[in-house]
Amino acid sequence: MNIIQGNLVGTGLKIGIVVGRFNEFITSKLLSGAEDTLIRHGVESNDIDVAWVPGAFEIPFAAKKMAETKKYDAVITLGTVIRGATTHYDYVCNEAAKGIAQAGTATGVPVIFGIVTTETIEQAIERAGTKAGNKGADCAVSAIEMANLNRSFE
């Protein structure tokens, strides 16, 4: 049996990151976690490009555009959606998730889902580097692994 898996060495990888500006006090921490983790795994800082968009709903569009350039070995998406009093949360979360998944499958470039979806602002803060770790850092590790896995299929 052959086991195919990606390693966690970022040397030589070019990574795109799309970040939603809405709830920027949280998404900026997700971005810092992602950048720090990428660099610690060997990705050069000048091989990381960041595109800011208004919010989570716009992330799939920019992620797909980045992936279509074929300049990136992986694209990380980072955003925060916090439930409010209306159904807006459900629409944004569902469409962002679908769009991010489609961006990866349509382009053949790994597109990593890093939208923090929570019931409360406290839960979002916890996932941006406090009690529950940093989702941006987790996504960076996934991006490195998937980029290397994708290379193994070429």
UniProtKB/Swiss-Prot annotation:
It catalyses: (2S)-2-hydroxy-3-oxobutyl phosphate + 5-amino-6-(D-ribitylamino)uracil = 6,7-dimethyl-8-(1-D-ribityl)lumazine + phosphate + 2 H2O + H(+). Belongs to the DMRL synthase family. This is 6,7-dimethyl-8-ribityllumazine synthase. InterPro entries: LS, LS/RS, LS/RS_sf. HAMAP family: Lumazine_synth. It comes from the Bacteria. Its EC number is 2.5.1.78. It comes from Bacillus amyloliquefaciens. (2S)-2-hydroxy-3-oxobutyl phosphate binds at A85, T86, R127.
